[in-house]
């Protein structure tokens, strides 16, 4: 389960490696799942990347370690919790997506992110 103060991996090549979730915009919920937009701050970053340490970004959750029940009755879970950083227009900050992403991301309207991903599970 992902909640405020959780550390997440970054699944794109924006330059950030680890981020900390600091909020859930427009929601009073405690937990988030795949496809939700969250506010994060960068905790670890590469020196030459677009994302800098300490900056605040919006991000979409693409993988969660907690099992997720689908409408057909099947369950899916991943090895880590991962996000993709978004720019101010809601587009991916990076140009490549690393690792698989859940199908629910495409269903939530992030079709550009789903098309960049090598594998949609």
From Swiss-Prot:
SMART domains: Ribosomal_L14 (SM01374). Coiled coil: none annotated. The keyword RNA-binding applies. Gene3D superfamilies: Ribosomal protein L14. GO terms for biological process: translation. CDD domains: Ribosomal_uL14. The keyword Ribosomal protein applies. It comes from the Bacteria. Part of the 50S ribosomal subunit. Forms a cluster with proteins L3 and L19. In the 70S ribosome, L14 and L19 interact and together make contacts with the 16S rRNA in bridges B5 and B8. Belongs to the universal ribosomal protein uL14 family. PANTHER family: 50S/60S RIBOSOMAL PROTEIN L14/L23 (PTHR11761), LARGE RIBOSOMAL SUBUNIT PROTEIN UL14M (PTHR11761:SF3). This is Large ribosomal subunit protein uL14. It comes from Hydrogenobaculum sp. (strain Y04AAS1). The gene is rplN.
């Amino acid at each position: 389960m992902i909640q405020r103060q959780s550390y997440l991996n970054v699944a794109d090549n924006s330059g950030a490696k680890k981020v900390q979730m600091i909020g859930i915009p427009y929601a009073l919920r405690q937990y988030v799942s795949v496809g939700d937009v969250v506010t994060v701050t960068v905790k670890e970053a590469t020196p030459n990347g677009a994302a800098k340490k300490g900056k605040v970004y919006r991000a979409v959750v693409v993988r969660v370690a907690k099992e997720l029940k689908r409408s057909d009755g099947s369950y899916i879970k991943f090895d880590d919790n991962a996000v993709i950083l978004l720019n101010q227009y809601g587009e991916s900050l990076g140009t490549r997506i690393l690792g698989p992403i859940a199908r629910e991301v495409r269903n939530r309207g992030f079709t550009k992110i789903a098309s960049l991903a090598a594998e949609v599970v």
